[in-house]
Amino acid sequence: MKKALVFAVCLAAVVISGCRSVQTVDAAHLEQIKEENKMSMEKTYQFIKEAKVYYLATVDGDQPHVRPFGTIHIFEGRLYIQTGRKKNVAKQLLANGKAEIVAMKGNEWIRVTGVLVDDNRREAKASMLEEYAQLKRMYSADDDNTMVLYFKPGTVTAIINSMEKPPVEMKF
């Protein structure tokens, strides 16, 4: 009986200490993933910002729609775009948040797919309008028309393509 009890205690100690090291590894791995996601988002943001214009694709029923945009912003660790709530694009995104962005810079282009989520908080709208002050002529953080949307974390795939280099795929 004593031997069985000693064995059980030793086994429990090994299991518990093993679990602790697994948790430490998992926490370190999660931090690494978070950092990689952050770097991928920043690289995506920088590419689109330098391209100046990107094209946003949405769907209305079975009909795709594409239009040019110019707003891209990082706020609270998320990648945001902006539009007017009264526009068809807003209605399409509220009905189906799946979207794709394409931008071209020199001989490279980026495709970003993901799910866009409406963020109606004043802080998010104000942050976007601070980065794009020229929009303050048409929009306000306090109006009912300004709409900012962020890419839902974990749904985003960004691929940078080039005629000269292999594609670079990033997820965040």
Regions found by a protein language model. Give the residues of each.
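Positively charged n-region of N-terminal signal peptides that target proteins for export
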Residues: 1-4
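C-terminal motif of bacterial Sec signal peptides marking the signal peptidase cleavage site
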Residues: 15-18
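Charged, gly/pro-rich active-site loop segments
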Residues: 22-36, 111-172
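Short, basic/aromatic recognition patches
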Residues: 33, 37-49
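A short, Trp-centered hydrophobic/proline-enriched beta-strand micro-motif
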Residues: 46-61, 99-103
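A mature extracytoplasmic/lumenal domain signature
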Residues: 60, 85, 105, 116, ...
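Hydrophobic residues embedded in beta-strands of well-ordered beta-sheets
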Residues: 64, 78-79, 156
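A short mixed-secondary-structure module that forms the rim of ligand-binding clefts
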Residues: 72-106
